[in-house]
Structure formats: structure tokens, C-alpha cells
Amino acid sequence: MKNKKWMAILLGGIMAASLAAPCSVSAAEKTTLTFWHAMGGTNGEVLQQIVDDFNASQDEIEIKAEYQGTYDDTITKLKAAMQSDSGLPDVCQMYDVGTKFMYDSGAVIPVEDKFESTGYDKSSVMEVISSYYTVDGKQYAMPFNVSTPMLYYNKDVFEAAGLDPETPPTTYDEVLEDAKKIVESGAAPVGYSQAIYGWFFEQQLAGLGVTYGNNDNGRTEAVTAVDFDSNGGGLKVFDMWKKLYDSGYFEDYGTTTADTQTAFFSGQVGMIIESTAILKNAVDSSPFEVGTGYLPRIEQNDEGGVIIGGGSLWLTDTGNEANEDAAWKFIEYITTPDVQAKWSMGTGYFAINEKAYETDDMKAYLEENPNFETAINQLKDSPVNCNTAGVLSGVQTEARLTFNEIMPQVYDGKLTTQDAVDQLAASVNKAIENYNESIK
């Protein structure tokens, strides 16, 4: 019923905008722009509604939204278009780890180049979000589908284990204490789990208040080497993962995050960490009451926080300034409070414009869905610095896969945690070296 209610609000907004739209001119007189994206399913439906809403709200620009498949499919097609110097979309959605490629491609226009001429208020986007797409002080892309990791827990299991269902653990030591009570009480077979996922490794480094890569995570100059081996963060993270695994209250479900989610939703596991992107589905579909908490910390650190994931919108350099200005109008429209509220309510992603949370619809939604407020507050409580900006690297997809290959060997005792740090650092450093050579 909740889904129907909020979808009705979204559809109502579209219909109202259509009725209020001025008489349209012929399609031939409109500027027609192409928008490539990777949003399928419900997210794709909500996005198409926003595109239709924009098209109906004015009579100068027509956006043609084109689904490209997965993020990897999208970047592959974009690279092909760049190489052929034809067929570039006017606007392209790109996942977070594609940021360095886009920056280095020379085929994009920084969105900040449009701010002054259009009077756009840069502060309308929360800085903790825009910082991910900011290089040398300039914002290159507009954040769009934004998520972070957080703790999910089964409130029914907590009650059965004698734990306070309103008080989630805040550190991994507390996670272990609660996991022990869950298992020993028989409330659930497994106390805690987290998928083997390189993104979580990056997040836990940020929680420690340290960088993944040198040169301030690549924010002041290009990354030339990792930092996590020399700043001690990498060893602390690997030690923590191994401690969890060896406790007897943890189960490893591998690198496929959906497998860990399935174990949680079936009641086999009391707590997991996962992206806020699954929160809407988790709350709507779980057979038990879901609780949420901040991503646990290895150590409490004022410099620590979470890094955003997800994707952003980029302006491509098509050589047609009029089209580029029109494309910016579409991106600017997407960042408005009402549109961001609709996007967030319809998908579960964060609204990037803080004023979206002040709209009546969003206030009502958050009152009905308090778990979403946990996610929002965690993001707002994260400091804005190079740690939480995340690493700007052209090899992060490869780096995450390498972590995924190394972690099981730590679990099995084939590698010590120090060996794991050394191997991961050596592999990623080599990949960084090769990437930097390739773009000279």
C-alpha cells in the first residue's frame, strides 16, 4: 500500500505538470537531446516520469531518455562513441567509479562551468555529496542516484535475543557483542554478515578517517599510489574482517551482495551492512520489522564518515553550445527540491538538494518511514574532507575485484592480514601506474 500511495503522488505530479504546460510547438522546433542512463525496473520508471514531466513543463527542449543496460554497458558504449567521435549523448549517467575516466576523457564539460552564467546556486547540493565529483575545486558532474552503506538489523531478532531493538551497535566491537547474544540465545543462526565487497573496504577506511590513495585521495593531484598500506588503515580493516569471521557468530556468503541480503531477509542473519539503495525494498518487503543504524566504525574518529556511491549526470562536449546549454537546463531541473523529493520517494536514493527534505510530501514520507531519516542523518553527519570524498582513481573497479579475490584467502588462513594489505597495495599500485601511463 505504501508503494501505491507514493507512486500516486509521483504520477499526480506528472499529470499536474502536463495540464499546466503551455501549448507545445511542433517537435521539429524543439531542441531534441539524448540522455543515456542505466536505471532499469522501478527506478527507470520513476526516471522516465521525471523526463516526461520536464518535457511537459516547457516547449523548447525534448529529452529522449535511452536505457543502455548496466553501468558497465553504459561506459562501454560511451567509450565507443568517444572513439568514433560520433553518437555521443548530450547527457550521460555514469557510476561513481567511472568518475576518473570521465574526468580524463576530455569529452565532458564540467557542470560548474554552467553555474555562473545561469545563476545556479552551488550550495543547493549538499557538499558532502558534491565533493565526490569535485576535482581541484571544480565540480565536474551533478550527483544523481546517491547512496551510502548502512547497518540493517532485524528488530524481531533483537527482541528475541534480549537486545534493545531501538539501539543498534555503533562499532564493530558492539556488533560482535550483539552477534554473540543473537546466536547464543537462538534468536537467529548467524549474528552478523557482510558481503565481500571492495566498496565496503573503502567505506571502512573512510570511517577510520584515512585515505585510500595518496595526494588527498587524488583530489589535489592524480593518485600515484595507495595510502592504506602506509597509514595503517588497510591493516585495521583486514584485521577487523578476520576477527568477525573467526568469532563464530559470522557467516560469509561470498561476493554476491544479493546472497547476503537473502540470508538477512529470510531471518538467518540478525545484522548486515548494505547500501541505502535497497532500503525502500527492505522496508516494504521484509516479513519482519527492519531497523537501521549508521555504518559501524572500527574506531570512533571525528574525521571519519561515509562516502557516497551510485552515479551522476555528465554533460558531454558535443561541440554544440546551444545543445549543451539546453542539456544543462534539464540537469538543473532534476536538482530542484520537488523533483528530488519525487526521485527519493520513488527510488530510495538520497535527495541531493537539502530543501527537498523540507517539502510537505517528503516530510510526510519521512514521518512514515523513519529508517530513511537514519540514512539521511548519517550522510549529514559525515564531515566534508578528502577521506569522505572517496578516492578518485581510474582503476577502482579493478581494485575492488582484487580485494574480493584476496579477502577469502584471509578467511581461510592462506594469507595473513599483513600479507593481504601488501598484495592488495602492490596490485592496485601497478594498475594505477599502468592507467596513468595510458593517459599521458
Describe the residue ranges of each PLM region.
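C-terminal capping/gating helix-and-loop segments adjacent to ligand/active sites or protein-protein/ligand interfaces
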Residues: I307, E373-S427
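Extracytoplasmic/periplasmic solute-binding protein
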Residues: V135-F144, P149, E159, E174-A225
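Short, solvent-exposed loop/beta-turn-alpha elements that line the ligand-binding surface or hinge
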Residues: E112-V125, P168-T170, V210-K236, D284-S285, ...
